[in-house]
Amino acid sequence: MRLTWPGHACVLLEGSQRVLIDPYVLNGTIPKDPDLVVLTHGHFDHFGETLTLDAPTVAVNDLAKALSALGMQATGLNFGGSITINGVTVSLTPAVHSVSMLELDGTKIMCGEAAGVVIRMDGVTVYHAGDTALFSDMRLIGELYHPDVALLPIGGRFTMDSAAAMMAAAYIGAPMVIPIHYNTWPAIEQDADAFKEAIERTTDMQVMVLPSGGSIEI
């Protein structure tokens, strides 16, 4: 599987399918023609280009219902639920974050709670924490899903910061960690290289700090 970080919280997974998570970047290009879009929640910096992409979408149930009402092919999940679409299994996990609201087609809608997602494709399991604070049940996410890669926000202010994300990485126990949701704006500036050094100095985990648009094979 190839993992690409276009920027912010947006991640593209390419294997037997093209799965795009949270299609928003501030300055850059959103990958086109995904087979599946997965949303962690409805805040603008995660919902992004969902309507323009017009691809099958998986989201928390409230948001999926709103998208379905607009004629999109959207599938809803709730915490603990999973669905498999064309060989890609998406599971919804809790996150600790605020409820989101969007204005779609001139109507303001409540988009439900924020979530994390676990995506399994081609024998690889990726956990995208979404926007979240640190919470102790991240240990259960590690025990239940055994992710190969954990995508963790480190920006602070609106999510956990790099120090809390270090604890999250230890709770989850994925062998590879990739920081996301940082340095998009001054309010969420963090030193990702220092985050990498601190984790790799004290654990056996590998931290991959990707440039915007950067990719790795996992």
Curated annotation (Swiss-Prot):
Annotated Gene3D superfamilies: Ribonuclease Z/Hydroxyacylglutathione hydrolase-like
One Pfam assignment: Lactamase_B_3
Keywords: Hydrolase
UniProt GO MF annotations: hydrolase activity
Family: Belongs to the UPF0173 family.
Protein's recorded name: UPF0173 metal-dependent hydrolase Mpal_1063
Species for this entry: Methanosphaerula palustris (strain ATCC BAA-1556 / DSM 19958 / E1-9c)
